[in-house]
Design a protein with these regions (language model features):
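Helix-loop "lid/cap" segments that line or gate small-molecule binding pockets
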Residues: 80-82, 96-104, 112-120, 194-199
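Short, Lys/Arg-enriched anionic-surface-contact patches
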Residues: 1-4
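An amphipathic alpha-helix signature
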Residues: 9, 52, 92, 96, ...
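Hydrophobic/aromatic-rich alpha-helical bundle segments in the mid-to-C-terminal region
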Residues: 127, 131, 135, 145-194, ...
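Helix-turn-helix
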Residues: 7, 11, 15-57
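Amphipathic alpha-helical packing segments from all-alpha helical-bundle domains
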Residues: 103-116, 120-150
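Short, basic, alpha-helical segments at the C-terminal edge of helix-turn-helix-like DNA-binding modules
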Residues: 56-63, 69-70
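Hydrophobic alpha-helical connector segments
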Residues: 66-108, 162-163
């Protein structure tokens, strides 16, 4: 991606995160960059093309992070075998990496803020918010935990309940990170360590 296209994407997303996607025009984006609309159109067809490129970039980043940390990059229905050998350590590392990504990466943080704003204005954005930030991660963890339970890595329990219990603190701490100068990562790291200890077969035997 050229430097100009990158600047257009990051500037547009920052404006979307501040004012909402619908409220920002191509003229606003071009003006912020000090370029004409015609110059911007050399790189993107329209505002929707910019948004689609932003979403594609986020999905690519998520897939790359999944592969780097040894967790599935696709949904369970598409690649069930990739869920069979996921370790608790891989899930922990991926969770920490995702927390850093959503809170420390400016592009990801702006994407999350944009979705938070737009979920109440657009059914499409609400669906995207659910897929990226809410229901999607819960369903993903449910599938991982179901496989862990089936092979005895975790004790027998309702995988949906475990997914909700695991993801809820993550969701909350990501949300409050925008308003807190103190890092929430230590709290999350301690929690996920406790979670896997609590639901490990070894812990049940000790109890």
């Amino acid at each position: 991606m050229t430097d100009t296209k990158e600047k257009i994407l990051t500037t547009a997303l920052h404006l979307f995160a501040q004012d909402g996607y619908e409220a920002v025009s191509v003229s606003d984006i071009a003006g912020k960059l000090g370029m004409t609309k015609s110059a911007l159109y050399k790189h993107f067809r329209n505002k929707r093309d910019i948004l689609d490129s932003i979403v594609d970039r986020m999905y690519q980043a998520d897939s790359k992070s999944s592969q780097e940390h040894g967790v599935p990059a696709e949904k369970y229905d598409s690649a069930p075998d990739s869920y069979q050998d996921v370790s608790p350590e891989s899930v922990k590392e991926f969770t920490v990496a995702q927390f850093r990504f959503w809170t420390e990466d400016p592009f990801a943080a702006d994407f999350r803020r944009m979705l938070t704003l737009e979920q109440y204005r657009s059914a499409e954005m609400a669906k995207l918010y659910g897929s990226c930030v809410a229901e999607g991660p819960v369903a993903y963890m449910e599938d991982i935990f179901r496989e862990m339970i089936s092979r005895g890595t975790l004790i027998s329990a309702d995988p949906r309940r475990l997914a909700l219990e695991y993801y809820s603190p993550f969701f909350l701490l990501v949300s409050v990170s925008d308003r807190s100068e103190k890092s929430q990562l230590d709290i999350l790291t301690e929690y996920i360590g406790d979670f896997f200890r609590r639901y490990s077969p070894a812990h049940r035997e000790e109890s």
